[in-house]
Amino acid sequence: MSAQLINGKEVSQKRLQAVAEAVAQRQQDNLHMPCLAVVLVGGDPASAVYVRNKKTACQKCGIKSLSYELPESTSQEELLALVDRLNADSEVDGILVQLPLPKHLDSQAVLERISPDKDVDGFHPYNVGRLAVKMPLMRPCTPKGVMTLLEAYGIDPKGKKAVVVGASNIVGRPQALELLLARATVTVCHSATENLADEVAGADILVVGVGIPNFVKGEWIKPGAVVIDVGINRLDDGSLCGDVEFETAKERAAMITPVPGGVGPMTIATLMENTLHAASLHDA
């Protein structure tokens, strides 16, 4: 029997609508309009698409967006100076620096320069640390989006065995913290993990984010598992696929996210929620 598809597009539209309603209510209450500043360095085509999608989401929600498109040659000092200006600008609630940055720039130093209360991506060590001690402030967008999807489909991680494949700072590590916060029993797999197939086979909830097409084989999936595929990879023929071998996995899983249309839309919806949350922090 084929798995039920987890429709991220549908869930994200509901979340965006809720943000739009909250923004409209803020206007009625004479509170300031939330504002997101997006910084793009260089001309990476995929990054340009992501930035465009974020601007579109802002328009849907009534969130003001400011765009800063900097040349590839931008220096570390110039980028940090822009972040400092945005930190000091009381009109700006959220700051997003689109990753990856050109190789000559230090991404970590840039992310750490963003004020934690404006870190709507949730990448600042302060925000990851707060998540680790069960006091989240700004939650990383993709992991929080995954948790929103699970909630929307009535999947409670409490007491379940959750396996996260991939240990990146953007997805894997904060995803493990989110699942731990939801009281799952969490295993994190990475490049040094032995017997990956055995680890995957024990998962009630499987979250994969490694950036390698079809990395997790369908036959590894535990029958009845919930599979969340965070990967999005473009193949030589131009088609998109995830990190999980979809066609075989959907014959074993109970529920699975498609690629595209699964986790991706949730990341942007969560970004809008975080920007709204940041605005509320700045009301006082």
From Swiss-Prot:
The keyword Mitochondrion does not apply. GO terms for molecular function: methenyltetrahydrofolate cyclohydrolase activity; methylenetetrahydrofolate dehydrogenase (NADP+) activity. Transmembrane segments: none annotated. Keywords: Amino-acid biosynthesis, Histidine biosynthesis, Hydrolase, Methionine biosynthesis, Multifunctional enzyme, NADP, One-carbon metabolism, Oxidoreductase, Purine biosynthesis. It catalyses: (6R)-5,10-methylene-5,6,7,8-tetrahydrofolate + NADP(+) = (6R)-5,10-methenyltetrahydrofolate + NADPH; (6R)-5,10-methenyltetrahydrofolate + H2O = (6R)-10-formyltetrahydrofolate + H(+). InterPro entries: Aminoacid_DH-like_N_sf (IPR046346), NAD(P)-bd_dom_sf (IPR036291), THF_DH/CycHdrlase (IPR000672), THF_DH/CycHdrlase_cat_dom (IPR020630), THF_DH/CycHdrlase_CS (IPR020867), THF_DH/CycHdrlase_NAD-bd_dom (IPR020631). PROSITE patterns: THF_DHG_CYH_1, THF_DHG_CYH_2. Gene3D superfamilies: Leucine Dehydrogenase, chain A, domain 1 (3.40.50.10860), NAD(P)-binding Rossmann-like Domain (3.40.50.720). CDD domains: NAD_bind_m-THF_DH_Cyclohyd (cd01080). Belongs to the tetrahydrofolate dehydrogenase/cyclohydrolase family. PANTHER family: C-1-TETRAHYDROFOLATE SYNTHASE, CYTOPLASMIC (PTHR48099:SF5), C-1-TETRAHYDROFOLATE SYNTHASE, CYTOPLASMIC-RELATED (PTHR48099). Homodimer. HAMAP family: THF_DHG_CYH. This is Bifunctional protein FolD. The gene is folD.
